């Protein structure tokens, strides 16, 4: 007796499967589209703040780096002059803010990539890490400069530090303006760093998380 050939029977999708697949796929696409739109808006906001922070940092660097005042009177042996490079804290300020300005300018293309690819996680993570380091450097420079500016205005009798701002008024005004510029720039950097880390409550972290989420939901059905 010859063996009968195996017969393959194709079974179509059940009505339950056909009804459940399309809404889930549509919901995945809608969630991913919502997340992409939100993150594109955040990336545009980040780009604006990044350019603003770079402008403030550049202005603060130029202001501090060109600060110099010479009093109109002098003696046979002394000339009364004040410059930013007379104080190491101000020199550190200029170097640190130059680094911050260069970083902010170089980070603009990465911010543009975040606008073009809003669900890309690597550029956003790189910007967050570098922004944190940049804010730390700018804060250190501003703090050290603020301490010297305070001593220049008020002096310190215990350290025999005389208040020089009564004589070098223009010098103190310029270094104070430079410190104010880095505070504004650091504030902008902190804001756009927080914007990159934020997300809406109704969306997931990125497109991969969206797919994994709906894969789990699909397995539970």
From Swiss-Prot:
Extracellular side: 63-89, 153-221
Coiled coil: none
Residues passing through the membrane, by range: 42-62, 90-110, 132-152
Membrane topology reported for the UniProt record: Multi-pass membrane protein
Function: Regulates membrane-cell wall junctions and localized cell wall deposition. Required for establishment of the Casparian strip membrane domain (CSD) and the subsequent formation of Casparian strips, a cell wall modification of the root endodermis that determines an apoplastic barrier between the intraorganismal apoplasm and the extraorganismal apoplasm and prevents lateral diffusion.
Any one GO BP annotation for this protein: cell wall organization
Keywords tagged on the record: Cell membrane, Cell wall biogenesis/degradation, Membrane, Transmembrane, Transmembrane helix
One Pfam family hit: CASP_dom
Database matches in InterPro entries: CASP/CASPL (IPR006459), CASP_dom (IPR006702), CASPL (IPR044173)
Protein name per Swiss-Prot or TrEMBL: Casparian strip membrane protein 2
GO terms for cellular component: plasma membrane
Regions of this protein lying in the Cytoplasmic compartment: 1-41, 111-131
Similarity comment text for this entry: Belongs to the Casparian strip membrane proteins (CASP) family.
Assembly description: Homodimer and heterodimers.
PANTHER family found in the cross-reference section: CASP-LIKE PROTEIN, CASP-LIKE PROTEIN 1U1
Localization in the cell: Cell membrane
Stretches for region Disordered: 1-21
